[in-house]
A protein has these predicted regions:
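Catalytic metal-binding core of the metallo-beta-lactamase
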Residues: 1-93, 152, 157-252
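Bilayer-spanning, highly hydrophobic alpha-helical transmembrane segments
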Residues: 85-142, 240-278
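Residue-level signature of catalytic and energy-coupling elements of molecular machines
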Residues: 148
């Protein structure tokens, strides 16, 4: 589009180049006559709806579409970086859970190798009770630990998008108050849930940044982009802190459930086998 290609033509070209299934579906809808922003929003995923809101906002406000999409694309790439960073940060707690979960069966194997066969004990009524209790505790502990990890994974969003969208509206020549209205309308129309409506209330960071720029007399656009990057930097720092806290919290299910399971499945059967052989 920066080279002068019309959006209706640029979209299928980009879809063919990338061979992305989502982009191909959007191009097919546009070819069937759907408006581009609506075709993008029909993909249903949050990142597509954000892109649809940015596209529709640029079209309606008269902002340069190529620049608007470049800014949103840079913001959306942050999602990939966050997912990669989160995978790395959570690898430690996940490895801890997997390692500790293997201890009970390993203890049984080790006891057998040492000559204390725990199988007769496990086949007795006492052993059956130990097996049931240990299995329940082990399953509960692993499930609990995994749920803690999923709670960190569930916050899958990009922060600061309201600043990017407001910048697009302002690039179209709208006054700050009108720009906020246009952004809110597009967010509502295309269902961009990563941009909450509380972002537009009085005292919110977006309104504070606009008021500061107008009061001091600095250019609004660069200030909004700087604020967007600052918000995303804080989100990255929060992700790191949350992953560090997870490394501590995951010790609770390991201590409350997995350790007793290790005793029930790995220690007591071997100990009873030893005592029975005396």
């Amino acid at each position: 589009m920066r080279g002068g290609v019309a959006p209706e033509r640029a979209l299928p070209i980009a879809a063919e180049e990338t061979r992305d299934p989502g982009a191909l579906e959007v191009a097919a809808r546009v070819a069937a006559g759907a408006p581009i922003a609506e075709a993008i929003a029909a993909q249903g995923k949050p990142e597509w709806r954000v892109l649809a809101a940015a596209w529709g906002l640029a079209e309606r406000s008269g902002a340069p579409l190529a620049q608007a999409l470049a800014g949103i694309a840079a913001a959306l790439r942050e999602l990939t970086r966050l997912r990669q960073q989160r995978t790395v940060l959570l690898s430690g707690p996940r490895a801890t859970v997997r390692m500790v979960a293997t201890l009970p069966p390993l203890a049984l194997v080790l006891g057998g190798l040492l000559g204390f066969d725990p199988l007769p004990v496990l086949l007795s009524s006492v052993g059956a009770a130990l097996l049931c209790a240990g299995a329940v505790l082990l399953g509960a502990g692993v499930g609990w630990a995994r749920s803690l990890a999923r709670s960190v994974e569930s916050d899958d969003r990009i922060a600061g998008l309201e600043f990017e969208l407001a910048w697009i509206a302002l690039r179209g020549g709208a006054a700050p108050a009108e720009a906020l209205v246009r952004v809110a309308d597009c967010v509502d129309e295309f269902g961009a849930e990563w941009v909450g409506f509380d972002c537009f209330r009085a005292g919110a960071p977006l309104r504070t940044a606009l008021a500061t720029a107008l009061r001091v007399g600095v250019p609004v656009g660069p200030l909004l982009l700087e604020e967007a990057e600052a918000v995303r930097a804080r989100a990255r720092a929060e992700l790191e802190s949350e992953a560090e806290r997870l490394g501590v919290r995951v010790l609770v299910p390991l201590g409350v459930c997995v350790l007793p399971s290790f005793i029930a499945l790995g220690v007591l059967p071997v100990l009873l086998s030893m005592l029975g052989g005396l």
